[in-house]
Structure formats: C-alpha cells, structure tokens
Amino acid sequence: MKSADIRQAFLTFFEEHGHTIVPSSSLVPANDPTLLFTNAGMVPFKDVFLGRDPRPYVRATSAQRCVRAGGKHNDLDNVGYTARHHTFFEMLGNFSFGDYFKRGAIRFAWTFLTERLGLPADKLWVTVHVSDDEAERIWKDEIGIDPARFSKLDEDNFWQMGDTGPCGPSSEIFFDHGPEVAGGPPGSPEEDGDRYIEIWNLVFMQFDRDSAGTLNPLPKPSIDTGMGLERVAAVLQGVHSNYEIDLFQNLLNAASEATGYDDTSAPSLRVIADHIRSCAFLITDDVLPSNEGRGYVLRRIIRRAIRHGHKLGAREPFFHTLVAALDAEMGAAYPELRKARPRIEKVLLKEEEQFARTLDHGMGLLTEALETLDGEVLPGETVFKLYDTYGFPFDLTADVCRERGVTLDEVGFQRELEAQRERARAASQFGADYTAALDLEGETAFTGYERLEDEARVTALVDREGNALAALEAGQHGVVVLDRTPFYGESGGQAGDTGYLEADGMRFQVTDTQKQGGHHLHHGVLVEGRLDVGASVTPRVDASLRAATMRNHSATHLLHEALRQVLGEHVQQKGSLVTAERLRFDVSHFEAMTRAQLDEVERIVNAQILANAATRIEHMTLDEAKAKGAAALFEAKYADSVRVLTIGADDFSIELCGGTHVARSGDIGCFHILSEAGVAAGVRRIEAVTGEGALAYFRDQEAKVARVAEQLKAKPEQVEARLEATLERNRTLEKELERLKAKLASATSGDMLADVREVAGVKLLAKQVEGVGGKELRGLLDQLKNKLGSGVIVLGVAGDEKVSLIAGVTDDLTARLKAGDLVKHVAEQVGGKGGGRADMAQAGGSRPQALPDALASVPSWVEARLGE
C-alpha cells in the first residue's frame, strides 16, 4: 500500500466512524509562543483539550504536518544517518473531546490495523501504563491480545502536556519485524533494537495535574492518538527504513538525478530528500530564511541540504529543483504546497546562490584542514577561522567532522570567539570621537528588539582614525553609520552585536557595534565590493550570537535576585559584562561566598529557568517603576520613561534594562557558575555560562574526567575512589621516604663529624650536603648539634637554580654568635637573604654555583666574630 493510500485510508476509516476530518494546520503554531514548530498531531487541538476553544465536533481526525528541527525536539543532527529520524513527518491522529474514551480508542486502533490494513495480530505488541488496569482489561478481555505480547511500563506510558494540566496514561502499539532483526520487546534490556517499532500511541487524557503534583480526574476524559505515516508505511511495504518507502524513494531518485549521484542509499541523499520536505512546507507556511527564530532554523536546514549536495559533487544550484518531485508526491494531499510551489522554488534558489561562494571556499579549506589534521580533534582556532574569516557555519563544520569521525574543539572555538570580541572592544576604544568628523542629524533608529534583519541607508562612513569617508573599498576597515539598524550597540554591560551589512556584490563584516552621540557605529571590514555613503544595505545580525547574549543577559537578572535572596538585601549590582560566551556580574558583598551559597544561588536560577515563565517588557515612568519594586543601578541616570524587564515565575525579578532578552526564562536553557572572586574591597565577581556555553563547559569537564579515568585505568564513576586510593598510597610512600631519608641523614651525620674543625676554640662545621630535603636538613642539624655538644654548624643544599641553607649554634655560644647573622652572611653570597633565632636560622638563595665559596668563607667570618 502506498503512503498516499495509507493516509487516505486512515482519514476515511475515522470519517466512517463519526470523526470530522480536520485539515493539517500550519507548521507555525497559532497563539502558542512555547513552540517553535508544530511537532505533534495534537498541537492544533491543545486549546480544545483545555476547554478554551469550543468546536462543533467531539470527534476529529487529521494528517498533521510536523517539524522537529529546533528547540526541545530537535532531530536535525541524526537525519540521514538513522532509519527513522526526520525533520519533517506526518502524524496521523484521531481525537475525542469528552466523547469516547479508552474502549473506543483501543477498538478503533485494533480494527484499523488488523482489518483495514491487514496486519497480523501475532505481529503486534501492546504496552500500557503500569497503573492502568482498565486498559489492560480491555486489551486482554475484549480485544483478546495474547498476554505473551503485552507488557506494562512506567514513565514510557504516561503523557503530559506540561508540568501542570491535562495528562494521563497511554497505550502503545508496536510492530514486530521478526527474530531475524536484532532487538527485544518494549521494557526489555534489548528494547532499543529495531525488531519492535512503535507505530501508534494512544493517550488517555483523564487527569489534570495541579501545581502540587496531584492528579485530579478530568470531568470529560479525552483521547489523543498519533501514528507516524512514514513508520506504518515502512511496515506495510516490508522495509526496515523509512527512507525505503515509496514516498522517499521518489524523492531520493529526484535528488540522485539533481546531484548526479547514483547510490540512493547514501546518507547525503537521504538528508536532501528529508530536508526538501521540511523546507518546502515551512516556506508554504510563510517561514522565510533569516537569522532569527524559525527563519534561522529554516536557513540551517537549507544550508545543510546544500552542503550534502556539494559533498556529492553538485556545484550548481539543485535543491530548488526538487520541489517539483515533492509536489508530485504530496501536492494532491496538501494543495497549499502546490499553490506555493513557485514561491518555494524562488526562495530556495536565492538561498543556494547566496550560500554558493561561502560553501565552495569553506569546504575546500575544511577538507584541507581535515586531510592535514594530526589527531582526531579539529582545533577551535581552525573552526573559528572558517566561521569568522570565510563565513562557514559552525554547525556545517560539525556535520562534516561527524562524517569523518573527527571531534570539534568547541571550547577552543568559543575561546577564539571571545578573544575576537575582546579585540573588537579594545579597538573600539582607540581614536577620536567618530561623530566629531560627521555632520549628522537625529539618531540611529534601533529596530533590534523586533527583528534581526532590516533595510537601511548608509548615512556616514569613517576610517579607524576618525576621518570621514565617501566610500569603503574591499579589505578596508572602517565604521558604518546607518539611519536604522537591528544591531544592538554595546551598553548596559551587554556587548554589541556582530553580523553583516549586505547588498548586491557588497558585504561588510560587523565585528562590533558601539553607541556614540545617539548613533550606532558598526565597526568592521569590507569583505567584498564597494560601500558608498547613501547606499541601501541589509543589516543582518548574527542570530546565534545574539541569542546566546540574550540568554546570558537574562540570566544576570535572575542571578541578581538570587544573590539578594541568598546573601541579603544589601547586595547591589556594581557592574556587568554580557557576551555570547559568558556573563560577568559584580556585586557588593563583604566576604567570599561559600560553596553552599554558590550552589543555592545556582539552584534558584535554574529553578526559575525550569519554570519557563514568559518575560514581560513594559514602559513606564521612573516613579512607577520604583513603586513596582524595580531594581536599578544606584549611580545610573535614567530618562523619565524607562524600560522595565520582568522575568521569572511570580515576577521573580523586576529591573530597569534596555538590553535584549529571551522571550521566556526557559530559553536560557541552564545556568552554571564558573567562578566567584573578589575584584575590589567589598565587591565580588561572579562568572557564569548558560545554554550552549554551559553544555560546552560540561562536555569539557566530562572529557577531562574521562582522560583522568584513562590515566588511572578506571571507569569515570570510579575516578574519585581510585584517585583517593592513589593519593593515600602516595602519602604512605612519602612517609616511608621521609623515614628512609631521616635514617640516611642520621648515618650521614656521623660521617660528617670528620669534617669538623676548630676555630678560635669553637668546633665549626660548614658543609654542603647531597640528597637531603628541607625537613631532613633540620633533622640533620639537630643530630649534629647533639653529637657536637658545643659548636657552630652551617649546612647548604644546592638544587636546580636554588639553594637551601640552615645554621645552628649551641646554646652555650649564642651569647657570642647568632645563627641568624651567620645564615644571613652565607645567603647574601648565594643571591638570597634570611634570618632567624639565635640558635637556629634558615635561608635560601638563587645561585647554587656560589655555594662552595660561600661555605668556605664561614671560618674566617666566625673567627672574626668570636675575636671581637
């Protein structure tokens, strides 16, 4: 049965059983800012389940278009390399809104699979939640499922919409591909194999979870089911990979023809065949390539497909030509795709043409770097050079490295990125006031709160010395002033944006953005073309860096309030620096924070991130903001109207801020404190990372633990115990070594007495000794003093570029000669100084070669002192 026939059979079956066929909704969720894309069949019915959206039906069925390529549900990296990962898929579903419940859902599913599709009952396996006795009875007593092909699972069979709200147990139906395929049944240790494949999930929404975690029965239990079209098609067509079904085979053949590559099983062709579906349908739903949000995800998918085509030998635009094959395959089922086909082809062609030069050059450089790589880790410096100098996207570099079995040095890449920003900030401090040479009216209009791409006009150009220019030529560094810009200028502790100013044949790389005299100054270099005053340009902010900066900036607000809660109300912000890589936050506090305090601050911030509360921006008078409890920098000056940011659950943090921020606290991802230290009297500095920066840090730490484990010949979880055992063994060996050295020193002291001489009637020993450490030197001195009974002793040890000295005078002689004076005399000759008590003194020096002569001078010095 073909994919199109399965889709239609599903919809027809449920229509025959009283369900209304609901057309697929947009991939852009309506009125749901929590989702990047529609990623499940129930998403369009979310408000129906919550009782907010009354519909004229209580039963519905749909074939919903879904995308998983960003945010929590992100399959992008696996697409093309596994049998069932896709950026785009179709979810077949049937829904009941307070109508039929478990019995109806189970009967419908079983009837459709075994009767309409003709699947053998003995090839199906069913699971239910461990607590769902009702569903178990229906399956066993009414459906007659073989108990040997039935299992009860825990969290795998419980679904919830969020931390609170509708939820309930589920029942999953799996298809058994047979013993010739590796893998075990659901719930077994071998369940990750490919033998048993989930094809349908029936969710029984019967509870409402409150904030305390209590499950309260819903007055009208509902049903939400989902069956992946691609998966069930693979079952019916007798193949183990979704890419082998008819729908994908036609797209793979088209991709093969477009790229000139014949092997349709190649992962790169699978990537292309998958990506044309998600890209085409996203554009159908009015998502366009950009450097922010959904548009940025779309651009990433397009460029990934282009890169895989390039890998197969395609050197001319090809991706847009696949829209025709997709239209032939899916246009009848989704007429909106057919209608949008011309627009889709134009958008894809434009992206291909824009990316062509970057890809060709970047791939050549990356290939060369990989071929000459010494080891299995691509240095962060190389990755950064590709990204910064040649505009080669980081994620594409990662994709290529993955294929070659090479690891990326992400930490090194981030370090280079931060170094560049530091250089840019430093460079921006040199020279005169750039606006002094300009005759400009008004201010640069900032549009970056709403968008990361705009259309603007160049109002002025300045070189790095502050001289006004009429134009910039390729390779020339300078500063560009625009009439409007989405680039955030460094202020309020937030680093300025980076990105590009683009026009036909012109590209200016923005390495930093500063604010001066009401204008945004875009510092950078003209990469190609010519840029004239008055020219129209498209400013495009680096979306990934802006997003990372926003995560870090929003985290500083949560951090500030968490510090006040843990340390006290006296805590005030004293400064901050927010970049894409990390955040630095200075606060007033009188002592170092304890480990427990740091852990509690980190816990509070992450709890607010997990709460995923919406961020709120408001404009009000300064007095209104103060009345609201908004925090502000004590020494800062504010306008009459201020911008107030509220972030976190229950208005956790309220502060005045003009920076850019995440839409929800959950967008920060996670938060980790790197360090806490004093930077001035009464000021503590905290450095932290969030999101990808935190993950990169954790990966780096994990890698270090793995390396230590390898050195210790232990598993990572055994490192602590093995290290403690090793340290304990070292301590034991050190004690034994000290004992042996002491024993050796004792034996040596007897031999050294032969070198004692008499000076002015006093026994004197001035000698260089070997193989003795600091502790042993003190013990040796005591032994010699005891054996001499009365006398003066100076001992010296020469090491690598250092000298250790010790002098001793027996108590009967200290009135006439001081050990401190004696050791000082010797130390001065070996490049050191020292002193001590009358009976014992120590010193050091830096000229071991002078030690013999220094010790040789002791007799005359002692004789002179005793003769006084």
From Swiss-Prot:
Keywords, ordered alphabetically: Aminoacyl-tRNA synthetase, ATP-binding, Cytoplasm, Ligase, Metal-binding, Nucleotide-binding, Protein biosynthesis, RNA-binding, tRNA-binding, Zinc
Segments for region (Disordered): 831-851
Catalytic activity, EC: 6.1.1.7
Binding, Zn(2+): 553, 557, 657, 661
Main location: cytoplasm
Localisation: Cytoplasm
Domain of life the protein comes from: Bacteria
Any one of the GO CC terms: cytosol
Function summary: Catalyzes the attachment of alanine to tRNA(Ala) in a two-step reaction: alanine is first activated by ATP to form Ala-AMP and then transferred to the acceptor end of tRNA(Ala). Also edits incorrectly charged Ser-tRNA(Ala) and Gly-tRNA(Ala) via its editing domain.
Homology family: Belongs to the class-II aminoacyl-tRNA synthetase family.
Domain remark from Swiss-Prot or TrEMBL: Consists of three domains; the N-terminal catalytic domain, the editing domain and the C-terminal C-Ala domain. The editing domain removes incorrectly charged amino acids, while the C-Ala domain, along with tRNA(Ala), serves as a bridge to cooperatively bring together the editing and aminoacylation centers thus stimulating deacylation of misacylated tRNAs.
Protein name: Alanine--tRNA ligase
Upper taxonomic lineage: Bacteria, Pseudomonadati, Pseudomonadota, Gammaproteobacteria, Oceanospirillales
